[in-house]
């Protein structure tokens, strides 16, 4: 049996403030740090022994991964970071409060911006200080690949080459692989793994720092998938994520 565990980063400071974050490099909150430790303890208790891990270029995912691996005494395993696992780019929405934006534009419009498969928010300017074109960490990325906004389909298309060519083939050499990333980048991976339609993927809500396990047979066919943790608690956390973009 082979296993990949997907984990969304712990609560960030902007999650706490209910802001659109996207590619903004926001740190974990104290709660987020504890969530990462708790996830690590849970996976250690369940006997997971990762030998390879992947994460994004954004510190909330990197620090979640580090927190998990530290608790599991797996700090030594190889970790690959890639911009392709970054969160969906929210364009000019980045930094805005989700509930206040819903008050201004309506719940339906904000849901479209947050989750629509093919409708991106208004792009930011290339010269905007928040733009990836102004960020030295993306200096080695081809300019045509850097987004100024994204719909979910763009995020999926960004991730797929790396998933197909790098992460998934890793299972041939490693029995257990951990991917720490973001709500929308993980949503793209899950869409592919479970063959979820464009319409249904927008209603998938991933709570922070809850391990999502995918088990494969030796031919790398998906056998089953499940969240680690109390089902009722996870359901409540999913509902809370769904309500983030609604009016107060």
UniProtKB/Swiss-Prot annotation:
CDD domains: HP_PGM_like (cd07067). The record marks 182 as: Transition state stabilizer. Keywords: Gluconeogenesis, Glycolysis, Isomerase. Its EC number is 5.4.2.11. One of its GO terms (molecular function) is phosphoglycerate mutase activity. It catalyses: (2R)-2-phosphoglycerate = (2R)-3-phosphoglycerate. Substrate binds at residues 8-15, 21-22, 60, 87-90, 98, 114-115, 183-184. One of its GO terms (biological process) is gluconeogenesis. InterPro entries: His_Pase_superF_clade-1 (IPR013078), His_PPase_superfam (IPR029033), PG/BPGM_mutase_AS (IPR001345), Phosphogly_mut1 (IPR005952). Catalyzes the interconversion of 2-phosphoglycerate and 3-phosphoglycerate. This is 2,3-bisphosphoglycerate-dependent phosphoglycerate mutase. It comes from Porphyromonas gingivalis (strain ATCC BAA-308 / W83).
């Amino acid at each position: 049996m082979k296993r990949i565990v997907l984990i969304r980063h712990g609560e960030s400071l902007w999650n706490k403030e209910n802001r659109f974050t996207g590619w903004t490099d926001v740190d974990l909150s104290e709660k987020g740090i504890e969530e990462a430790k708790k996830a690590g303890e849970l996976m250690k208790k369940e006997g997971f022994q990762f030998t390879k891990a992947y994460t994004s270029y954004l510190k909330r995912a990197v620090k979640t991964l580090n927190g998990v691996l530290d608790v599991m005494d797996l700090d030594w395993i190889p970790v690959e970071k890639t911009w392709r696992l970054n969160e969906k780019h929210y364009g000019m929405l980045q930094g805005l409060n989700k509930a206040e934006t819903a008050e201004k534009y309506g719940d339906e419009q904000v849901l479209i911006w947050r989750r629509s498969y093919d409708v991106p928010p208004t792009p930011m300017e290339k010269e905007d200080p928040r733009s990836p074109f102004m960020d030295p960490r993306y200096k080695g990325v081809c300019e045509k690949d850097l987004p100024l906004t994204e719909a979910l389909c763009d995020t999926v298309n960004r991730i797929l080459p790396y998933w197909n060519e790098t992460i998934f083939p890793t299972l041939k050499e490693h029995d257990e692989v951990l991917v720490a990333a973001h709500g929308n980048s993980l949503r793209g991976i899950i869409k592919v793994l479970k063959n979820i339609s464009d319409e249904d993927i927008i209603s998938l809500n991933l709570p922070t720092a809850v391990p999502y396990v995918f088990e494969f047979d030796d031919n790398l066919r998906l056998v089953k998938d499940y969240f680690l943790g109390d089902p009722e608690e996870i359901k409540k956390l999913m509902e809370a994520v769904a309500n983030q973009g609604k009016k107060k």
